[in-house]
């Protein structure tokens, strides 16, 4: 009898344990599925991006995004370490130019099969930024935006100088810049050209853009050598140097912050910077300006552009179901590009660019077409070093009136040396 009672007790305990386990499992699966996420957006960018994440979490009870914002200065160091250690989050933000630091080592997931299986709307993306995230024919990231260099124009200064049309050729730009200075006493062409505050990336971006406008390329097709020591590079650098040295439409030693403030305060006519400057400029009272794609001053429209992308770290045990959840989040974030456009960036979704919400944003519609003519940096792991080094060399060439051929020879040798180390 005692053994029988003990047996009944054991059976009861086993049943209770099973019930508790089942209840725990149900509790675990009944809650939302979590997608962890790292971003690098702070300040104004961070506020707009966080609003998209909040909206996703409000409208998706089954999936929740858990976002960890990392300061930009530390972001890629932390990301590189996490990917190498295998403890990266489920989803990451990565600049298009940085993708190649992780793709060759298999640290990012190839998305093609997952995109097809989940009917991801790839046809709704502008082709250029989408294709810039492909390597060896495979899609490794989805572009969130493009942020090309564009031209800002002070319309009041043009009116005071009697200029009716925005210049479309280099000769017109120079002539109008000179006229602005003669008629108004203001700066004609506003391009920063010193590393005093911030690297002179604007020079590299314009040098890059002018080469592509002529039909050239910055590097060879295989990205193994410089390709600008030719007539395209000569003409591009000559134009930038002449603005400072020959025509005096741009002062030498103009730093990034001063260049921004000169235009912001109405003291410059033609200002070149990325789309990210729009948010700051539109807050300036009584500044009557337009923001447009860089005209094809040297041929066809083409402009340097960066791009924030969304990628999925490759993990050994990642399930197709979890990838589906991540793609759901990516679809939502890119599909709400009108919210992100408030930070100045150009959406990559065609439906967003055609939406009323985007059209109603001031200035953005004026440069939305720049996405189609945006040119991404070459897909080489050496690009970051090339980018910074060329900015220094271009600064020296422009500010010191270095002979053009000498400057191109020096840049070519330096770039080829950098590439050889990768």
Where are the predicted features?
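Short, low-complexity disordered leader/linker segments with a strong preference
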Residues: 1-36, 58, 353-361, 409, ...
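Hinge/lid segment of periplasmic solute-binding proteins
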Residues: 23, 96-150, 174-176, 182-184, ...
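Extracytoplasmic "Venus flytrap"/periplasmic binding protein-like
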Residues: 55-125, 134, 159-168, 262, ...
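Conserved C-terminal helix/tail region of periplasmic/extracytoplasmic solute-binding proteins
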Residues: 64, 159, 242-245, 369-422
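Periplasmic solute-binding protein
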Residues: 99-107, 112, 128-166, 193-222, ...
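Short, solvent-exposed loop/beta-turn-alpha elements that line the ligand-binding surface or hinge
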Residues: 112-125, 193-197, 201, 212-235, ...
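C-terminal lobe and pocket-closing loops
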Residues: 116, 271, 277-286, 297-392, ...
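Glycine-centered hinge/linker elements that transmit conformational signals in sensory
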Residues: 176-179, 222-252
